């Protein structure tokens, strides 16, 4: 999601250099990138990083440094595809490739998104339980219905503006990591010298980290939000939306990088904080949100559960509409149905029905006996298996001159994109082969 930068005019309120004016200007510029980055740190991400830090201490810190350029490159490719073609990924596949490829890609997305949405809904319920003594099972249905109603009769922008500030509470992991006083030599070594073990548990954590940082749902969402931005500026036909200037592409790259950097900073400090607290204390098996909250105790003490609860609610409410929305975009584009969050429900009824069905199917996943943290972690592992085939398609599309014209990938983008693809394939295959060892 991006905003087209404009030159400030003499009367532009952004020139107001009061604290409020500067804050408002920063908010407008980084807003879209921040929402994308914060939604990548959804409850499944938080759960995965918590398991990583609690299980292996600082051993996976290097993944934050390693995945940042990869995820930034992939997300910019998706943004560029939406900007140049004026369509989402499913629309591009429908127009330029065989139906079997399109259907396979959309099926992979639906499986990943529905399970991920279900796990995130469960995490929101568990987070509310941290704040009030209400059974999470009693909260699942009301939360799901609320999310559907807000998406259909409200707007995602309303959700994003309301809940991205709650997601900011995740910044507390940064403070907690410092207050826990980790060994600086160990931290630096784990950050810059990769540790790798051919063991099922370690490999599952690596696959999960890749799956939750380079996530299938963000591929489709990023491209579609570029299209939504164009429509919001009055470019309602495909011909009007096609193409982008160098300045627009440069700004989109900056916006994506800001969001992904924020996401990975939070990822790094969640692993660091949990490694310095839970792993050090010997609590390597995390089952509940209350267990995960202990990583924040060095900073806020008894308020740890409250702070984590707020963060999980904020990140979950950001992520679930993106998960269900990207599924709805993909299916609607596949069949040529009217779609878009700017459309009224009566005009794009099938699009909104898809959102509702995706949310409700995710809701029913929660009525199993799997605990919240386990569900979040294995959702990320699943994403780690489903993302690589979609990455192959993104790389093929972004190097197709018929589609991208003069904006095909450069050498660095191709190196980063194919590196992400190969590494994720390799990690998933290694996990399969070592599983029974």
Residue ranges of predicted features:
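Loop-to-transmembrane helix boundary motifs in multi-pass membrane proteins
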Residues: 99-100, 137-140, 303, 307, ...
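Flexible loop linkers connecting adjacent transmembrane helices
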Residues: 8-14, 48-51, 76-101, 126-128, ...
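Juxtamembrane transmembrane-helix boundary signature
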Residues: 35-36, 63-96, 104-115
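Transmembrane alpha-helical segments of multi-pass small-molecule transport proteins
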Residues: 106-107, 131-153, 169-178, 349-362, ...
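Hydrophobic alpha-helical segments and their helix-loop junctions in multi-pass secondary transporters
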Residues: 168-199, 203, 209-228, 393-402, ...
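Hydrophobic transmembrane alpha-helices that form the core helical bundles
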Residues: 80, 84-85, 102-133, 140-144, ...
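Extracellular/periplasmic helix-exit of transmembrane alpha-helices
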Residues: 70-84, 224-232, 261-291
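Membrane-interface loop-to-helix entry segments
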Residues: 142, 151-181, 382, 387, ...
């Amino acid at each position: 999601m991006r905003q087209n930068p404009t030159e400030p005019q003499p009367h532009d309120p952004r020139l107001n250099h009061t604290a409020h004016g500067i804050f408002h200007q920063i908010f407008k510029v980084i807003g879209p990138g921040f929402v994308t980055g914060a939604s990548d740190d959804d409850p499944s991400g938080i759960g995965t990083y918590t398991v990583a830090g609690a299980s292996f201490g600082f051993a996976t810190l290097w993944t934050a440094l390693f995945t940042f350029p990869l995820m930034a490159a992939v997300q910019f490719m998706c943004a560029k595809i939406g900007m140049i073609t004026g369509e989402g990924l499913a629309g591009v596949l429908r127009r330029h490739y065989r139906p079997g490829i399109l259907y396979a890609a959309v099926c992979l997305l639906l499986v990943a998104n529905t399970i991920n949405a279900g796990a995130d809904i469960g995490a929101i319920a568990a987070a509310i339980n941290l704040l009030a003594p209400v059974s999470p099972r009693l909260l699942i249905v009301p939360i799901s219905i609320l999310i559907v109603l807000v998406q259909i009769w409200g707007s995602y922008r309303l959700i994003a503006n309301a809940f991205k500030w709650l997601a900011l509470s995740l910044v507390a992991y940064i403070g907690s990591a410092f207050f826990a006083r980790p060994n600086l030599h160990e931290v630096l070594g784990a950050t810059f010298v990769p540790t790798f073990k051919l063991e099922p548990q370690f490999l599952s954590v690596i696959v999960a980290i890749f799956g939750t940082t380079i996530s299938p749902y963000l591929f489709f969402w990023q491209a579609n939000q570029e299209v939504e931005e164009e429509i919001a500026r009055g470019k309602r036909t495909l011909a009007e939306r096609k193409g982008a200037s160098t300045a627009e592409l440069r700004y989109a790259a900056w916006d994506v990088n800001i969001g992904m950097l924020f996401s990975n900073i939070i990822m790094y400090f969640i692993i660091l904080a949990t490694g310095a607290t839970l792993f050090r204390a010997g609590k390597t098996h995390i089952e509940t949100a209350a267990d995960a909250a202990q990583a924040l105790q060095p900073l806020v003490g008894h308020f740890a559960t409250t702070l984590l609860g707020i963060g999980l609610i904020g990140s979950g409410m950001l992520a679930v509409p993106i998960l269900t929305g990207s599924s709805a975009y993909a299916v609607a584009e596949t069949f040529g149905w009217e779609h878009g969050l700017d459309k009224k429900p009566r005009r794009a009824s099938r699009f909104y029905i898809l959102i509702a069905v995706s949310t409700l199917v995710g809701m029913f996943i929660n009525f199993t006996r799997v605990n919240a943290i386990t569900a979040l972690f294995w959702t990320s592992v699943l994403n780690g298996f489903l993302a690589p085939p979609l990455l192959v398609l993104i790389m093929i599309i972004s190097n197709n001159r018929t589609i991208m014209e003069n904006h095909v990938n450069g050498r660095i983008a191709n190196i980063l994109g194919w590196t992400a693809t190969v590494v994720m394939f390799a990690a998933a295959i290694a996990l399969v082969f070592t599983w029974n060892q």
